[in-house]
Amino acid sequence: MKVFILCFLSGNELDDIRVCIDFETAMKFLERYKKSHQVLEYNVTEGITDESPVFSYWYKDDVLVKHVF
């Protein structure tokens, strides 16, 4: 299972945190708020998210960027 954290990143602070379990919905949210938000993708192990995200997604100059951790 995967969990997607939709958030506003301000420096090292996370604000406006929302949780989604569907990739398509997370990407729709990101498209809507692409100037200010990012999506962090986590694996879920034994009912809880892993310590670190697997991927992060954000827009830079209207181009979707995917970062692998």
Regions found by a protein language model. Name each.
Residues M1-I5:
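Short structural boundary motif marking the start of a folded domain
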Residues L6-L9, G47:
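A generic structural motif
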Residues F8-G11, I21-Y42:
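A short, charged, amphipathic alpha-helix used as a generic interaction element across diverse proteins
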Residues D15, R32-F69:
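Short, mixed-charge low-complexity intrinsically disordered segments
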